Amino acid sequence: MSQIIDVPETLSLAIDSFLSYIEVERRLSPVTVENYQRQLMTIAQMMVAIKINQWSLLESQHVRMLLAKSHRSGLQPASLALRFSALRSFLDWQVSQGMLAVNPAKGVRTPKSGRHLPKNMDVDEVSQLMNIDLKDPLSVRDRTMLEVMYGAGLRLSELTNLNINDIDLQEGEVRVLGKGSKERKVPLGRKAVEWLQHWFAMRELYSPEDTAVFISTKSGKRLSVRSVQKRFELWGVKQGLSSHVNPHKLRHSFATHLLESSGDLRAVQELLGHANLSTTQVYTHLDFQHLAKVYDAAHPRAKREKS
């Protein structure tokens, strides 16, 4: 069992100030702030272990030593890069605040991690997942969540944070507040619109306590991230899918299927809410009207049924 090392205020106070800055001024999500806190407190504990109790005493050789120790402990390259990124951003902030003269992490490199193509479901598997037995309102709610997640390519947090006034059923659009509090509009697709209409007709039966689109049928409160993950996993098993079903996989499937059909990487980037095109390029083997046109022509569940 590893020993818990107390972090002195000479290290922790600066971390607390930085966390307040990224939460209030940069408006980063609670999950991101928590990740920063975890990484920086781990680094601070490692510094205490080598007798460094002030950030001003940290030098480049110490940064390399901390990274090497993290690597030896079994930290994978991607996780190591995340830890180093948190440290570098934190030290950059200290420089901007006049707390440090230079950033000791500048010029230090971490092992490169290869980017792997995210796993996704094929169109037949998506259809199998969606074809659920609608015996009760709970099933209707879950079917609607699945359709919206796949139809709009949302992040899990974006799905759970949706409010009624974010949905425009007439236009078939959803307003999403993504990473860094950046707002974007995304087409929903015909199937998602139809199922939202079904769910909205039932939602009021559960005395919703707030404006959340997706609520618990027991409490009427907004569904948590973990609750959605459990429901998606449950339906994957019930529908006999061989691979594990999770919200992220549906988002990846949305991106892959749309890119395969349209070849429009830039449009997919905008729909996913990626700040950098390089993030979207992992799926490779504008204005809103243009995005909607690409979506309507390419997405499997946006196409009109033939009469």
From Swiss-Prot:
Xref: HAMAP family: Recomb_XerC_XerD
Q: Which SUPFAM superfamilies match?
A: DNA breaking-rejoining enzymes, lambda integrase-like, N-terminal domain
Q: Which organism is it from?
A: Proteus mirabilis
Q: Does the keyword DNA-binding apply?
A: yes
Protein name per its UniProtKB record = Tyrosine recombinase XerC
How is the enzymatic or functional activity of this protein modulated?
FtsK may regulate the catalytic switch between XerC and XerD in the heterotetrameric complex during the two steps of the recombination process.
Q: Which GO terms describe its molecular function?
A: DNA binding; tyrosine-based site-specific recombinase activity
Q: Which CDD domains match?
A: INT_XerDC_C (cd00798)
**What Pfam families does the database record attribute to this sequence?**
Phage_int_SAM_1, Phage_integrase
Q: Which PANTHER family match?
A: PHAGE INTEGRASE-RELATED, TYROSINE RECOMBINASE XERC
Q: Where does it sit, as one GO cellular component term?
A: cytoplasm
Please give the InterPro entries that the UniProt record associates with this protein: CB, DNA_brk_join_enz, Integrase-like_cat_sf, Integrase_catalytic, Integrase_recombinase_N, Integrase_SAM-like_N, Recomb_XerC, Tyrosine_recombinase_XerC/XerD
Write out the entry's keywords from A to Z: Cell cycle, Cell division, Chromosome partition, Cytoplasm, DNA integration, DNA recombination, DNA-binding
- Residues forming the Core-binding (CB) domain are 9-95
Q: According to its UniProt entry, what is the function of this protein? A: Site-specific tyrosine recombinase, which acts by catalyzing the cutting and rejoining of the recombining DNA molecules. Binds cooperatively to specific DNA consensus sequences that are separated from XerD binding sites by a short central region, forming the heterotetrameric XerC-XerD complex that recombines DNA substrates. The complex is essential to convert dimers of the bacterial chromosome into monomers to permit their segregation at cell division. It also contributes to the segregational stability of plasmids. In the complex XerC specifically exchanges the top DNA strands.
UniProt subunit comment: Forms a cyclic heterotetrameric complex composed of two molecules of XerC and two molecules of XerD, in which XerC interacts with XerD via its C-terminal region, XerD interacts with XerC via its C-terminal region and so on.
User: Taking every annotated instance into account, which residue ranges of this chain make up the domain Tyr recombinase?
Assistant: 116-296
Similarity comment text for this entry: Belongs to the 'phage' integrase family. XerC subfamily.
The UniProt entry's GO biological process terms, in alphabetical order, are: cell division; chromosome segregation; DNA transposition
Q: Where is the active site?
A: R155, K179, H248, R251, H274, Y283
Q: Where is the signal peptide?
A: none
